[in-house]
Amino acid sequence: MSVKPNYSLKPYNTFGVDYACSELISVETKSELIRICSKLFAEDKPYLVLGGGSNILLTENYLGTVVQVCSKGIVCHEDDEFYYLSVEAGEEWHQLVEYCLATAMPGLENLALIPGTVGAAPIQNIGAYGVEFMDVCDWVEFLDLRDGALTRYKQEECQFGYRESIFKGALKGISVITGVGIKLAKKWRPNLSYGPLKRFENTGVTPKEIFDCICSTRNEKLPDPRLIGNAGSFFKNPIISFSKFQELIGKHPSLVGYPLPDGFVKLAAGWLIDNAGLKGASVGDAAVHEQQALVLINRGQASGKDILKLALKVIETIKIQFGVTLEAEPRVIGAYGEKELIDD
């Protein structure tokens, strides 16, 4: 465990914005994570649990303790039908995908190259290319800060939805994820529902081929946060009623939407932003990415407030042009913790 006072968080957020925290504590084990978070909670001190920093937007210096989760460890067992993995919260998600592929336990390849740690995956139910975390989740282990109990919720208890979970709802602020259980079927079935993967239908595709295709597609579409600051897709794909979709498709015949089982339609937020003429739009050094409209980038010297103002500009424009409200994926962090996506 290391403790660093008044420390810059620039290396710890993928937007690369330069704000500091009052104290940065890096914890290497589950027991350290439990002890530190329990102590901060009991003393009613402000703190922020940080994984890879790929789903936050800092807008000012944080006046509290940042707890960086660095706990590592993967334990595997199996039965006749499944592989079961117990994974510590500080493991890198993409490295877990690579590990499973290298050890002949496929099933995560569609989720390749998603930045961040394993402990963050359940919070917003990460997903890409036809697969979500909930599809491979067996359980989530968390510290209940109210009573100090280490608790496991089965998949069905986690209230997963589109970029949602109980950890963003009822357990927000009173739980710290310490590990997750992954369940992968031994009878592997490729998920080829997403565009670039459809070419593999009826080809006897391998997990490695899907992995390579996903990595290639993401590298073509999404900027590398090590080179250009970003948090991946900044906006959720909005879900609207079928009647609203019919109204919009009448005005915009090329509108991209995906029918959902409950009669609603999920719109492609990237299409909305692109067709609103917002690709390349900027505020200061923050900009909408030219290749992928869902992504907001830091061209080098953007502040968190620049990115926030740009996000609000995009939301306002889409609301005016299409009557649809976009929601942000990243958490906005101010001086005293998470706050609403509003201009301050």
Swiss-Prot record:
Keywords: Cell cycle, Cell division, Cell shape, Cell wall biogenesis/degradation, Cytoplasm, FAD, Flavoprotein, NADP, Oxidoreductase, Peptidoglycan synthesis. GO terms for biological process: cell division; cell wall organization; peptidoglycan biosynthetic process; regulation of cell shape. Pathway: Cell wall biogenesis; peptidoglycan biosynthesis. Its cofactor is FAD. It catalyses: UDP-N-acetyl-alpha-D-muramate + NADP(+) = UDP-N-acetyl-3-O-(1-carboxyvinyl)-alpha-D-glucosamine + NADPH + H(+). Its EC number is 1.3.1.98. Residues 17-187 form the FAD-binding PCMH-type domain. It is found in: Cytoplasm. GO terms for cellular component: cytosol. It is an enzyme of class 1 (oxidoreductase). The active site is at residues 163, 233, 329. One of its GO terms (molecular function) is FAD binding. Belongs to the MurB family. Cell wall formation. This is UDP-N-acetylenolpyruvoylglucosamine reductase. The lineage of its organism: Bacteria, Pseudomonadati, Pseudomonadota, Gammaproteobacteria, Alteromonadales. The gene is murB.
